[in-house]
C-alpha cells in the first residue's frame, strides 16, 4: 500500500508513479506539484487484459480471455498539463481511444456533472 508515499513525492511524475504502483483498488488520481504541474492518472494496479477490449460483457470460460500480469506505470493512461489548464473528473470519462481501452469503457457518468463544474 504505497499510497502514503505520494506525500513525499517532489514532482507530479513521482506522485503519478507512486499512485500507479499503490496496492489499492483502481480509482482516479488527480494531483498538482509545487511547480503548478497538474495531472490525472489511475491509482492502483491495472491488469493486462488479453483477448477482449472491455466494451461488452464477455465470458472468460474458454480461456481465450485472461489477465496476464499488470500494466507498467509507463503504460497507464495519464493527462499532464492539459491545454485547458484544469482537470476535473466528476465520475465521468476522462480519456478515450487507446487510453480508455486500458481501463475500460463503462460505468461512467454521462458528463452532466462535468458541465456543472
Where would I find each of the regions flagged by the language model?
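Accessory structured domains or lobes within enzymes
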Residues: 1-116
Amino acid at each position: 500500500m504505497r499510497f502514503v508515499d505520494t506525500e513525499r513525492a517532489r514532482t507530479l511524475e513521482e506522485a503519478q508513479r507512486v499512485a500507479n504502483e499503490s496496492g489499492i483498488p483502481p480509482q482516479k488520481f488527480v494531483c498538482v506539484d509545487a511547480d503548478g504541474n497538474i495531472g490525472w492518472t489511475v491509482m492502483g494496479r491495472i491488469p493486462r487484459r488479453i483477448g477482449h477490449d472491455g466494451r461488452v460483457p464477455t465470458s472468460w470460460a474458454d480461456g481465450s480471455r485472461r489477465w496476464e500480469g499488470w500494466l507498467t506505470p509507463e503504460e497507464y493512461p495519464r493527462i499532464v498539463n492539459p491545454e485547458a489548464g484544469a482537470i476535473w473528473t466528476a465520475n465521468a470519462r476522462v480519456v478515450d481511444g487507446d487510453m480508455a481501452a486500458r481501463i475500460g469503457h463503462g460505468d461512467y457518468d454521462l458528463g452532466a456533472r462535468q458541465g456543472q463544474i
